[in-house]
């Protein structure tokens, strides 16, 4: 009779974390991002501490994005082709996002994408860590993670909504004296990258859904003519700003 091979022994949590050092580093930085984001959204330590947590959340997200970009493109090259390839990666988009907003006036809308992306991505690795503890360990946390996974599509749409409406928010910040002159232009560049993202089409999809919804609303007979004309002109202007060839 042929010898049957026994399955390899399951790694404990410490051995599992140490055997996947890069993934573990990203997991820890994402958890830190989630913690700092919550401390900013719920400023229990006061407004000054909340502003510090805002910067820490964005810096931690920048670290996570840089590690993820290195994982996706491990061989760095100082060339135009490598830069073009890097700009197609979602991790590069959110590295730029964090650097754009880290020194800006802290607003809740700008922290939600960082918070929710970190939460979603940390969920997958947290499940693996729980599996290393045992199949039935910490069922409360497992059930919570399952609910997050089940609502992933709605969360991604909410993130895309924040990405879109942060564009007019940067313009408002400029005129209110809370933003720099370059912020709207730099953020517009980020938004075009999100619009053309290959792995995350939610920004592009939400733009289309908002346009259809607004056109349906202004075409109703009860809508004033001047408001209809203003909305249609705004839609045409935004459509001209959208990247082509997507």
Regions of interest found by a model, annotated:
Residues 3, 8-246:
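Multipass alpha-helical transmembrane domains of eukaryotic endomembrane proteins
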């Amino acid at each position: 009779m042929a010898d049957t091979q026994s399955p390899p022994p399951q790694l404990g949590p410490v051995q599992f974390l140490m055997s996947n050092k890069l993934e573990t580093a990203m997991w820890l930085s994402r958890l830190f991002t989630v913690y700092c984001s919550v401390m900013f959204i719920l400023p229990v330590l006061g407004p000054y501490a909340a502003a510090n947590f805002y910067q820490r959340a964005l810096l931690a997200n920048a670290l996570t994005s840089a590690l993820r970009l290195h994982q996706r493109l491990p061989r760095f090259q100082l060339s135009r082709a490598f830069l073009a390839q890097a700009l197609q990666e979602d991790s590069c988009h959110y590295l730029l996002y964090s650097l754009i907003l880290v020194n800006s006036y802290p607003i809740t809308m700008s922290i939600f994408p960082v918070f929710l992306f970190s939460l979603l991505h940390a969920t997958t690795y947290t499940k693996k860590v729980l599996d290393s503890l045992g199949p039935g360990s910490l069922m409360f946390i497992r059930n919570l993670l399952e609910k997050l996974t089940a609502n992933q599509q709605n969360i991604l749409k909410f993130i895309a909504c924040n990405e879109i409406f942060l564009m007019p928010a940067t313009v408002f910040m400029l005129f209110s004296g809370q933003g720099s002159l370059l912020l709207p232009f730099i953020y517009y560049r980020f938004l075009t990258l999100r619009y053309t993202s290959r792995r995350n089409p939610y920004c592009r999809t939400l733009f289309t859904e908002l346009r259809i919804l607004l056109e349906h609303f202004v075409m109703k007979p009860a809508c004033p003519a001047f408001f209809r004309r203003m909305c249609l002109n705004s839609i045409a202007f935004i459509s001209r700003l959208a990247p082509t060839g997507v």
